[in-house]
């Protein structure tokens, strides 16, 4: 869940990347307009550093020999027609779910919705894992689960997320400038902000920090991106998987920032060769978002 307060629709009808945009998200909380030349200069340097880091990653990925490292070796030579068919069915399911969410925006989000969403997405992941194992794949090897140490995974994810924020905030700012600063929040954000019991908040925290990052990164980056890259190349794979990721949250004001976030996750996975790096970034992003919602004074200008 790119926690930007997603609508109750797809994989988290909780939702929102990894409170929503408007007044209830980390972007709104941390994206205040600089009030001085010094802060403006710092923001500009931060953005330039972010662009440099991700352009460098893209350049390094492009300079590699295909099928020799990380996600290339794991998916390009392996995923075939059966996986493409399964991915197509998953994408169709996503579109149907998004359509249902958009057509019924007034559905009240609740703990029952959250639990049902968890069970549904968990079943989808289990089906895909079972299918891949039946086909003879080693999922842990494909995802690079043991490629990096725990410390290396955590530090890499934290650094790449740090440099992703200026890109996300820029997309958020541009969206607000073009379409106006909407006040709507994603359902999970409203649910979290309005929850009155520690049990409800703990349930949302567990889902957003531990469950959603694993499920979404497995589906969007490991599987869908892997299949798309196999047939259409890295660029279209990153682009289309990020579009699906943003659309799956069914919250239009958050679409552009979530698209950028999904692209950063895919680049991190492709560069590191480990889906755990993308999962770490996603989990940290959602953790910061919930922290901003719970303690807005920390992130206020």
Q: Over which residues does each language-model region extend?
A:
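N-terminal, membrane-interfacial amphipathic/helix-forming hydrophobic leader that caps
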Residues: 1-141, 147-148, 290-301
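Membrane-embedded alpha-helical segments of multi-pass membrane proteins
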Residues: 45, 119-123, 206, 256-264
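Transmembrane alpha-helical segments in integral membrane proteins
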Residues: 53-58, 124-134, 209-230
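Hydrophobic, lipid-facing residues on alpha-helical transmembrane segments of integral membrane proteins
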Residues: 86-97, 154-170, 174, 210, ...
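Juxtamembrane helix-loop-helix connectors linking adjacent transmembrane helices
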Residues: 99-118, 130-212, 230, 298-301
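Residue-level micro-sites within transmembrane alpha helices that shape
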Residues: 116, 120, 215-216, 220, ...
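Membrane-interface helix/loop boundary segments of multi-pass membrane proteins
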Residues: 148-154, 215-240, 270-274
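Functionally important transmembrane alpha-helices
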Residues: 231, 235-301
